[in-house]
Structure formats: structure tokens, C-alpha cells
């Protein structure tokens, strides 16, 4: 398992390995891992190979013992020759199961290495997909409330402390802060990828734990920091959030995400097949395709996590206009480090060390001259100096 993981890792990042001239280091690490595998496999195969001969030798010793002892007793006229033959048959019936056990032991030994990971996976606690007396998502407007939320991936280390906020239907909420402040974690809690340690998250007054997970997540459309596209046609990837969408709807979503013109330049258009890692399109184009997928899904709540971090400035402006149209009348959460993209947000939540230290719109936060103003001015100064 370790050597397979190492090979897969190096294969996936072979360009980085070559760029840093680490081929010899990678080969050396592979040889070390392979030597460990060879030594353990050699011992395993040696013991497995010796098991059957040893069992057969033990069985043959039984025949020899019966023959010698039986011959001696026959000479003494203690038993008959027929009794000796009977004992030989009994020995065969006794040794045959032992040999079968040895064969099974070889099979168990060969699967022992994999069983540890398999049972580790099976022992993982499954998500509770269904709630008792679940609340229907039909008719929900998209009002979101965080009530004194506490959370930590490790209960002994809480990273989000007493998080509280109210978001009204149709508002655009921006969450900003330094790396590790807890911005992305809040989104994962909202969609119940994790459950809060204490407190509650509510949608239209209903605790999100009262919804079935699948129905809850149907309310959300996501554009993640790490784009994900599967091996298949471009149209199938865009339709992932709405499998029954027509081709015309796919094209409309692509136009709204400003990716339609790019798709038209491809030899097969929307039927072009993306490879396993979608490496036959650029990172910016992958970002646009995921935005088109979110537009087509038409969610009630939209989540953008660094949505425009991998595209050029011109494309970013186009995407921002398209997303502004999409977010009208729809509750939207935007996570971004470039504060220039969220100046029009209805509410900006400034997070630091898991806590909301400031909140308000862009102008209000600048007037406070606090942490947000410090972040914004530092980015503006950096942009000016680079220009």
C-alpha cells in the first residue's frame, strides 16, 4: 500500500519533481520503500512456502509411526494386520484437515496487510443521512443564523469560538481573514460536512440537523477553492448539478460564466472529453466550468470559496458581473483574500483565530479603522507598489 501510494503521488506530481530536479531523490526514496517491501514479502513468501512441506512431513511421520509401532505389535500378536491398515486410514483422515488449515493460513497471511486498512475504513462512523421527522426544504427562503457556534476538529483544540451572525435572505455575505482564521470551516459546518460541538446553525429558523443531509445540500451551489471535474464531456461536467438539464440550459449557464466562447473553440465543443485530472484545460478554464455548473444548478444558497483566485484580471471582471446577476435574490457566502472583489457585499464578517472580530459593510469597516481596514490598506499598498 505504501509503495503504491508513493508511485501514485510521484506520477501525479511528476512535473514538479522534474522542475526541482528531484528525480534522484525520488528514486532513492522508492528504492528504500521497495527494499522494505522486498524484505517483508520475502519472509512472508518463505514462511508460506515452507508451511505445506512441513505439514506433509508431519503427516508422513504419522504414517511411519503407525507402521513401526503396528509392525512391532503385530509381531507380538497384540493386534492384527487389518488393525494397522485401519490406523493408517485414521492418520490420513487426521492429517488432511491440518494440510487444509495450512492452505487457509497462507491465504490469510497474504490478506493480512490489506485487512488493516480495510477494517480501518469499515470502522469509520457513517454520516447520519436521515433526521427524525425531517423538515422539508420546500419553500425555504434562505435566512441563515449562526448561534454561538463552537467547533474544533479535535475537541481539545477549538478553532471556532462563539461564532454568531444573522444573514437575511438574498444578502451577499463576505467572510474575510488571514489563513487559518476558520473561514472555510464555517462553510463546511453550514453544509454539515461536520457537526458543531455546541451551538446551532439555522436556516429559516430550523436547525440544519433537522434536515436530511442530502436535501440540505441540494440547497447549496458551490465553487470551491480546489476545482473538481471528473473524466467525461464538458457538458456532463456542467450538468453535474442538474442532470436533467437540456443542452440549451447548459449553453446558457456557460454563457453566464463566460466560458461558452472558449468551449466553441474546442474541436468537439461541449462533447470534448476531459481526462482524469482535467489537465487538458487550464486552471482558469476549470474555474469557469465549475462556476457554470453552479449557475446551472440554480441553488437557493451560493457558496464561493476563492472563486476567482485562479483566473486573470479580465476574466475575473467578467465572472464577477455574471456572479452578481446570479446572486440577486439568493443568499450568498463569498470567501476571498482579495478584498477588492467583495466591496459590494451587504455584510462582511472579519474573522481572526476563529472569532468574528468585526462586521459591517465595506464603508463601515473602513471607518472603524480596525483589522479589516488594515488588511484592505495593506493590499491596496501592495497593488500600488507593484504597479
Model-derived features: where do they sit?
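Conserved catalytic core of Hanks-type protein kinase domains
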Residues: 10, 20, 121, 265
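Conserved catalytic Walker-motif region of ABC-type ATPase nucleotide-binding domains
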Residues: 30, 118, 146-148
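An intracellular "coupling" helix at the cytosolic face of ABC transporter transmembrane type-1 domains
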Residues: 2-9, 15-61, 107-110, 127, ...
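ABC-type nucleotide-binding domain
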Residues: 123, 130-131, 137-387
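Transmembrane helix-loop junction
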Residues: 18-19, 72, 76, 265, ...
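Helix-loop-helix
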Residues: 43-117, 121-122
